[in-house]
Every structure is written in C-alpha cells, then in structure tokens.
Amino acid sequence: MLRLCLAFCVAFVGLHMPTALAQTTSLQGSPGPTVAGWIESATFPDYGITLNAKLDTGADSSSLGVTGLDRFKRDGKTWYRFTLTGMDGKTVTIEQQTNRTARIMRAEVEDTRRPIVQLKICLAGQVAVTDFTLTDRSDRRTALLVGRRFLSSRILVDSGRTHLFPQPCEDGK
C-alpha cells in the first residue's frame, strides 16, 4: 500500500512539475518578471524620447549616453544640463538637480565619477523612476544600458533574443 501511494505521489508530482516550473520561470502574461530580449526599445515618456537599450545583467547600475553634459550651480545647488537624442533624431535638453555621483571602475582606464540623475523609463511594459549615470556612449552600440537595479524583480533577460517588445509600453506612459 505504501509503495502504491509513493508511486502515485511521484507520478502526480512528475505530471505537474512542468506547470510549476512554468509558473516560476514566468512566461509572458503570467505574474512575475517579464521576459525581454537583451536589446529592447525604451522610452523616456516625460520627454518623448525612444532609444535602443542593452539589458545588461552584468552591470549593477544603468547608464545613459548624453551629449553636452554641463555642470552648473543654481540657487547654491549642483545641477546638470544634458542633451538626449532619440532613435528618430529628436533631441531634448534636460536640466536636473543632483548631488549624487557614482565611481566607475574599469580595468583599462582610471576610475571616474559620473553624475547620477533620476528619470522615468518605460521598458518592456515596465514603468519606473530609476537612477542613471550620465556619460558619453557614442562609441557603444546602444545609447542606453539598463542594469540589475532596474531589471531585478521586473525583467528576465533572454540573451538569445532581441526586440521582443517593439513598443516599450502599450500607451507610451
């Protein structure tokens, strides 16, 4: 009797294991993180700018490629002015107050400090205000690198696919 019960339990678990695994790996439409490709379109809805983004699980923070980065003081506080250029060529100049910087350590060059700003981003249907370091990414494939701080608990990256979300957000917000 015990063997029969054990055999039934093993068979039952075996039949239902794929369902349980599918739920924990969170396929599109199920609760939990969204699956996205390693390159996706991302929108900054407050500015109407869309960029290609590299989703990089090896990077801790997110980095935004800008031009004309300028530090200045306004009312005794540190501000940054920078220009963001979308895939369609549209440009917008943004001014944001911040006192925060990130120390960037790379093996081939000396450590640098980059300003950190907070911007609202929409990526793979996920909208959030997140931190971005500002830098020149003109020598990179994408102007935007999205790191683990944004991806964690929101997006799982399929490293074999790209552009699973042609529209970053359904309603652009």
Regions found by a protein language model. Name each.
Residues 5-16:
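Bacterial N-terminal signal peptides
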Residues 21-173:
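Pepsin/retropepsin-fold aspartyl endopeptidases
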Residues 1-2:
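N-terminal secretory signal peptides that target proteins for export/translocation
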